[in-house]
Amino acid sequence: MAKSKFERNKPHVNIGTIGHVDHGKTSLTAAITKYFGEFKAYDQIDAAPEEKARGITISTAHVEYETPARHYAHVDCPGHADYVKNMITGAAQMDGAILVCSAADGPMPQTREHILLARQVGVPAIVVFLNKVDQVDDAELLELVELEVRELLSSYDFPGDDIPVVKGSALAALEDSDKKIGEDAIRELMAAVDSYIPTPERPVDQPFLMPIEDVFSISGRGTVVTGRVERGIIKVGEEVEIVGIRPTSKTTVTGVEMFRKLLDQGQAGDNIGALIRGVNRDGVERGQILCKPGSVKPHKKFKAEAYILTKEEGGRHTPFFTNYRPQFYFRTTDVTGIVTLPEGTEMVMPGDNVTVDVELIVPIAMEEKLRFAIREGGRTVGAGIVAIESLE
């Protein structure tokens, strides 16, 4: 059978299931594919392949499906540690999440932890699926669990009162046993996801940013910086800023090249060479960025949510303490930074995830949700993300 062409006629949204172990994340994922995609059974999803992101191995299952309004890529992780790693490395970007909570158990420790992580890594919106409602006979009890979940979401700054909560049973949907809490609930859930989770802004529409990977000097033409445009569009003749490592400076892009051809613009996803005016070869370096003036600021200090690799994952064998000094790999370069642990945290063990304060020795062009690797002499020992609301 020939590979079908990916039709780009609907907006594309990345989502994922989050929540406590055994509350039904994978069953729900299977149930959604039954009505909106190519059916994937529970065990097909549960046997998630391993993949590497920022030097870290993560098991993730990817399924796709579509509603009349949108095309979805959906990620489901088999284990709790995979969720933590996934959300921090951004291996699977989430524009929104479906929080699955068992009506029989109510919110559990990982329910809380996944909501906190979603907050820290900036997942924009959450929709709730209250699963296993057939195991609860008492309507009042069901209302109580819903209230508990809403309060929990509010305590982490999500709008708990406004978030759609859909009650149903993923198992009933898979077994066709009770249409009201089965198929109907799944359809209601996807309608809520369609309307409540915002369509992400496409990278091309965002302000221009290109991490600088290399710098060349071309005799008679000037200095060329190369890299992959992360977002936005750059047109010949536009002014840009060079941000990070050194004081911010302005320049004009006088040429854009791709595959040795001259273009009038470069856009998100393109690997380009940009000719910049009045900057000599040693006035710019790898690790800086080119961006739309005023759109990104350099920072030395930030708060981060980080996951520290276990010994088995190739990480450290020993814990670290306040004043730990690894390298932080941002986009294209390593910068040394000093770590301060939160009050009451004596040390961080391999395998932990933790919120830390970091001060770099030189400033880096930084924004909330920027991801990085933590390295010791070129070896990855952790991954992190700049926490939201953590930059001055």
Curated annotation (Swiss-Prot):
Monomer. It is an enzyme of class 3 (hydrolase). It is found in: Cytoplasm. This is Elongation factor Tu 2. Residues 131-134 are annotated as: G4. Mg(2+) binds at residue 26. Disulfide bonds: none annotated. Residues 10-201 form the tr-type G domain. It catalyses: GTP + H2O = GDP + phosphate + H(+). Residues 76-79 are annotated as: G3. NCBIfam families: EF-Tu, PRK00049.1, PRK12735.1, PRK12736.1, small_GTP. Pfam families: GTP_EFTU, GTP_EFTU_D2, GTP_EFTU_D3. GO terms for molecular function: GTP binding; GTPase activity; guanosine tetraphosphate binding; translation elongation factor activity. Its main location: cytoplasm. Its EC number is 3.6.5.3. Residues 169-171 are annotated as: G5. The keyword Transcription regulation does not apply. One of its GO terms (cellular component) is cytosol. GTP binds at residues 19-26, 76-80, 131-134. InterPro entries: EF-Tu_GTP-bd, EF-Tu_GTPase, EFTu-like_2, EFTU_2, G_TR_CS, P-loop_NTPase, Small_GTP-bd, T_Tr_GTP-bd_dom. Belongs to the TRAFAC class translation factor GTPase superfamily. Classic translation factor GTPase family. EF-Tu/EF-1A subfamily. Residues 55-59 are annotated as: G2. Keywords: Cytoplasm, Elongation factor, GTP-binding, Hydrolase, Magnesium, Metal-binding, Nucleotide-binding, Protein biosynthesis. Residues 19-26 are annotated as: G1. It comes from the Bacteria. The lineage of its organism: Bacteria, Pseudomonadati, Pseudomonadota, Alphaproteobacteria, Hyphomicrobiales.
